[in-house]
Each structure stands twice: as C-alpha cells, then as structure tokens.
Amino acid sequence: AGPNYRGHVEGMARRRGAEPQYPARPEPNFRSVHALIGTEEKIIVPRECSGAVQPEGQLAVVIGKKARNVSKDNALDYVFGYSIGNDISQRVWQGNDRTMFRGKNCDTFKPFGPWVVTDVDPTQFRIIVRHNGTVWEDFSSADQIWDTATWIQELSRYTTLHPGDVLWMGTEGADGDMVPGDVIEVEISDIGTLRNYVVAEE
C-alpha cells in the first residue's frame, strides 16, 4: 500500500517542507521478494547510505486463494491471515525516485513475521514501533484511509492476486533514523513482535 494513514502523509510532507497531499484513491507500489528477511535477522545498511534509513511498522496481509475482480463485500474471504512487516526506507533515495524502488527494496529492507494469524479482525490491530526499547509509533489499523477489503478489491481489478502474495498496509508516522547497533521492534496485538538488528554493510 502507498500512503494509507493520514499521519504518514502529513509527516512525510513536513520532512519535505510541503503541504500534505492526500491520495484520492489507493496507490499501490511494489516490494521485492529478495528484500525479505525474518525476525531476529539483521537489517544491513548499504555502504552508499548516508543516514535517513527509517522503519515503518505495517500490518501484512497474506493472500490465501486466487483473487481477480473480487468485490469489497467478499474480499476478506481471499485472505489466509495476518502478520507483521517492517517497510525499511531510505528517504533520500525514496524522494529521488518516483517509483520508490531504490529506497524501499535494498537487500534486508523487508523484515516479515514471525507468525501468521487467522480469524481476526484486521481493523482492530494495535501497532507499536520501538527503537532500542523506546516507543516511536503507537497506532491502530482502524485509522487506515482504505481498509484491507478495499485494497484487495482495487488490486484485483488490475492483476490476479495469488496464494502467498503479501499486501503491506502502510504506516501511520514518519519515524526517526536508524543507525548500526540499533534494535527495531514492531509489535502488533494478537500477532506478536518482529525484532531485527541494524548493522552496517561490511
């Protein structure tokens, strides 16, 4: 998911010194499977980075069956379950690339896990991001601009969703910078905690 919380739109606008511009419709973008890592693994900051690497705690929605042109009313029938994602972002590269590909898809920039839970309400998750034990963000999936069902409906109009596809549902804030030595945790109620360690590329 592109911008999906008003707080994130506003925080990123402040970073640019601009007025917030709220999207008129869901704006999907792509994340590389090669950037995925699991819990307790290392987030490797590339040598070329000069700071501005930030976490984004996100609800992750795992598709369970093939979905094409589905309605919002039955969209959640295509969900297998829910997990945790951390959409690591290098803000300078992100801002210089209209596709956001470089700033979002570096190796190890997509921590995911540790569990997938089923039979829960995706609109009622509490999402907490911690930096070295200090809470950076604390928000609810109820505050999404567009909910999970809307995203599945919209995406399935243009492309077939397949079992194992994962939708990352956006974040609320614009967090501070991470540096090597930091520990980043994303906790989502009823799912668990995704924990990763920030290191520099050797």
What are these regions (language model features)?
Residues 38-75, 80, 85-88:
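Non-heme Fe(II) oxygenase catalytic core, chiefly the N-lobe of the double-stranded beta-helix
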